[in-house]
């Protein structure tokens, strides 16, 4: 018997929160290392969210979804977030600004993970319900809205 969409959504919410916790945890790791950890956590998060809706993905496929969601956002948004990571890295490298840099990185990473998770949830939910695939523009709008909501918390 298939799970109800409500149960799938609840499971996906847990996976999103787990992914957020993982990327926030990477903020205390030096920035030149945490990029890889953050990317791995987001790829694993996409795999976990897909699994909630009965979609089995490899880690490579999960990472491809993450890249697709990020690229749906556009280069300006991507550049802004990469710039934020670089600023955090510079602040952390001074020693004096480590706590501020780590806090900035944690906040940005949490919002980014929330946006990735929300976009993955919408994508796989649509597929689970047998609806048409979301367009690049729709994915981008879901991503932007989720990022703004989390960033403003």
Question: Where are the regions that the model predicts?
Answer:
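Conserved phosphate/anionic-ligand binding catalytic regions in large, soluble enzymes, centered on
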Residues: 22-38
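A generic, lipid-embedded transmembrane alpha helix
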Residues: 72-85
